[in-house]
């Protein structure tokens, strides 16, 4: 059913994401923030992957937020965009969270928001200040 379809899509995302990160461990990835691009350390890339995957499947969203995301580009062709967002649900663990948009190498997009992680945790994982 519906839930299984979402779970399947999440599985595809997390599997592909992990593969991109593993690949990046050998070749590296780039990080773009505030218009500046730098190379991303494989350890930072792995920490970010663990953080995002540990948060589990969030709430799939039809559109992404305004503003400049923090972008990680993997050599697999996949792109990860992250935004800090407000989580309006009253049941949310935190009033803010992270919006994740993952674009597969084939152009397919999987995007969701989660209150399980915060942008400062993302910055810490990436070694940003």
Describe each model-derived feature in a short phrase.
Residues 1-129:
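Function-determining sites in protein domains
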